[in-house]
Every structure is written in structure tokens, then in C-alpha cells.
Amino acid sequence: MSNRKLFTPWSLKGVTLKNRIVMSPMCMYSSHEKDGKVQPFHMTHYISRAVGQVGLIMVEATAVTPQGRISDQDLGIWDDAHIDGLAALTSQIKTYGSKTAIQLAHAGRKAEVEGTIYGPSAIPFDENSRTPVEMTKEDIKETVQAFKKGAERAKAAGFDIIEIHGAHGYLINEFLSPLSNKREDEYGGSPENRYRLLREVIDAVKEVWAGPLFVRVSASDYKTKGLDVADYVGFAKWMKEQGVDLIDVSSGAVVPADINVFPGYQVGFADTIRAQAEIQTGAVGLITSGLQAEEILQNGRADLIFVARELLRDPYWPKTAAKQLNTKIEGPVQYDRAW
């Protein structure tokens, strides 16, 4: 076993990851029949990273309603007909030693599908975007129940971990940010009110899900009068009280913004939330080397490393990272002669 922290196990609620590497959820827009079902591409895409020894494979943003899709070719979990394909996917991933997670999502005003799109307020993302319909309280209630049903289906499909997508300008993020939420009822105004939708979604999911629960957040709006990491420390404390186990810390995309991007540019947000809210965090964003990942973990800045585009470039990134750290990890027996 490697003595590098990146390759130490991580355990929670009966789920043990063999290492701290997470395949970050990345939309593939590959449900080409527009029915939200798993396709052969998804099987190849995710299973190849399991063969590559990723500890946790997180399936991309999966829509809890048809109108909550980012595109009409997104994966879906709004119908029982989606369960079989997702179950086949989780089963195959686990065959190769990885654990499985799914990100439950609703795109809100950033949905690019036919028909009505919804948001907390009738404010478009930008001048080139459609204007959403402001959600009624009944719309909100139905959406909360859609997340609950999505969690039930995720459980039926055999996922080990659920993540609620509260980042990147999608519906939950839109409710959290005062830049996109101008409501005057109990879902707008104060931080407590803007958090209410996420609170209700977490409570609903936990009614049917006892396993590890993550929430992805955008810890900065990168705009004056928008949210910053201090606001998310407060939200994270509330999430912890509700039983959320880990905050997956990203940033941006609730409104157009100029973002100074550099290697590990979001790690400081994960560090701050971890320290000040006393909750486990995942670091994500331009983490490309084993040395970089190991530094984050060794210095207690995050608990898990979410790797995105680097895993698109290199499905066997765990082996690459191990080599960079001058250590060895066990690989597939079929690859012994080259591993």
C-alpha cells in the first residue's frame, strides 16, 4: 500500500474509497435519444476510469425533471425507466473496484430545452439567454419532491453516494445567490430564506437516503453584492447541522464574471470552509498533478480530490499521479506487464 495520503482509504457511513481520487461530475451530453437514458458511451466512459483505479466515480449532473436538464441530451433520473441503465452502470463500475456516486441536478434558468424554463425570479442569465418563469410555491414543492424521487431511484440503482448539485448557476445556486434571487416571499431576501430550497431538498433526500451525502457549491459569485466564501461558511454550517457529510467546493457561473483562473484556484475556498465550518470538503479545479493533490491533502486543505479534465485526458491518471509521487499502486491484473 502506498504511504502517500492521496492513496489512503477514505471511509464514511459504511462506504470506503480505496483512495482519495474522485472523478468529478462532467456533463457528456450523450443521451442522444433525448430520453435521459444511459448509452454505450456512458458505460465506456465511466468504466474506463474505474479500470484506471479512480476511488470514486461520480456520474455527471443527472436531471431530476425533464425541464431541469441543461440540454435535451443530459442523463435523467426523473422516471423509473432510468433505473435499469444506471444500475448496469454502477454494477460494472464496482466490478473494477471503484465506488459510485451520482450528482442530482436541476438546471433552473440555465436549462436549454424546449418549453418553459424555471428560476427563482424572472431574470435571464445574460442578454443572450431566455427569461425563466418565476417558480410558484407549488413549482418549488414539486421540485423538492423530484429530488427526493431522484434519490430513491439512485438508491435503487445501487449508488454508494449522492451529491446534490448546488453550484454553477443552476437552480439551487440561483436561489442561494441574491444576484439571481429577487423573491419577496420566504424563498428570497435573507440568507435563511435563500437557503430554504436547499434546506428542503436536503431534508427530502435524507428521508429516503441514509448513505453519504455531498453538496456541490459555488463558493464565490465573483461579483460585487454577490456571495463569497464567508457566506458559504454559513451555509456549510447549516448543511452540517442537516447531516450533509462533505462540501464539494467549486465556484462561479451564477452570473457572467471574469474569473482569474490558475492551478488550484478554488482550493482556498475548500480550505476555508473545511476550517471554519468544520466539515469535510472536496477540492476541485485545475488540479492536474499528483504532487499538487498530495500537497492539498497533507496540509489539511481538503479531504478528497475531485479531478475533472485531467481524467478526460488521462483515464489512468491515478497511475500517473502515483509515478509523480514516486510510489506504486495496484492496477488491474490484466495490465500487470505494463503497470
Curated annotation (Swiss-Prot):
Which reaction is the catalytic activity of this chain? A + NADPH + H(+) = AH2 + NADP(+)
Q: InterPro entries under this entry? A: Aldolase_TIM, NADPH_DH_bac, OxRdtase_FMN_N, YqjM-like
Q: Under the GO molecular function aspect, what terms does this record hold?
A: FMN binding; NADP binding; NADPH dehydrogenase activity
Q: What is its EC number?
A: 1.6.99.1
Needs which cofactor?
FMN
Any idea which UniProt keywords this protein has?
A: Detoxification, Flavoprotein, FMN, NADP, Oxidoreductase
Q: List the disulfide bonds.
A: none
Q: Name one GO biological process term.
A: response to toxic substance
Q: In which residues is FMN bound?
A: S24, P25, M26, C27, A61, Q103, R216, A308, R309
Q: Which PANTHER family match?
A: NADPH DEHYDROGENASE C23G7.10C-RELATED
Recorded family membership: Belongs to the NADH:flavin oxidoreductase/NADH oxidase family. NamA subfamily.
| Its biological purpose | Catalyzes the reduction of the double bond of an array of alpha,beta-unsaturated aldehydes and ketones. It also reduces the nitro group of nitroester and nitroaromatic compounds. It could have a role in detoxification processes.
Its quaternary structure?
Homotetramer.
Q: What is this protein called?
A: NADPH dehydrogenase
Protein source organism? Bacillus licheniformis (strain ATCC 14580 / DSM 13 / JCM 2505 / CCUG 7422 / NBRC 12200 / NCIMB 9375 / NCTC 10341 / NRRL NRS-1264 / Gibson 46)
